[in-house]
């Protein structure tokens, strides 16, 4: 296992629970300064502090996994993922089968994103250290969840900073279909995990969409950067008078059109508009009572 020794006086943030160690705090790396993987962290007096993941090319050199001397293996990931899954299941509506299972540092799994879309999982391994543990994570997910397939979509600028290559493809089970149908708070959506934005859907906006339903009645609404039309559909479900869904991407608007139909909303009750949101906002004056911006 890699061993990291901190400079004198730099152990404080880690001892207080900070999940990151920056490169400037490190005195020495033993076992391979250019290697990524699991590393033990010690202070300058050789006291063990924590166990984390080393990213040799990142300014955030270490991301802490645990402050306990526990093995970083399949059982470790099974425990962490089970805990995060239990938290979600305790608050989610039964009419929801799409949500984030693992949210990086928020679930003490730095560099790992796992999103559930109905019977499929989409993963992102966004740090060099977590990338090294890909097979272990996939094994834990396969054992815990009866997913039809596990798909990887690791891409974006953050990978350049970590010194790892983008990776997109099937990790286990079946490949996802071209479009997956999901349900969120009773509304249905088709999503494209391969070509869509992020992992296929903006799961982090679920609560904001639900709030919009409660304030949309009889209002004229401009949904900027509308993508697959999720805010528009929630607004129509809340009784909105009129919706304009604005996006610069034609494929996104086509996806929104399908989702409107899937939820029983006639396209005639809303307008799908291709254009630049910033330009349109300057020109529309006070025509819209609500303007979701995501």
Language model region names:
Residues 1-118:
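Non-catalytic accessory regions of SAM-dependent methyltransferases
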Residues 102-109, 113-115, 132-202:
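Non-catalytic substrate-recognition/targeting regions of SAM-dependent transferases
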Residues 21-22, 41, 50, 121-124, ...:
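Short hydrophobic-aromatic micro-motifs
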Residues 118-130:
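A short interface-forming secondary-structure element
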Residues 174-294:
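Rossmann-like S-adenosyl-L-methionine
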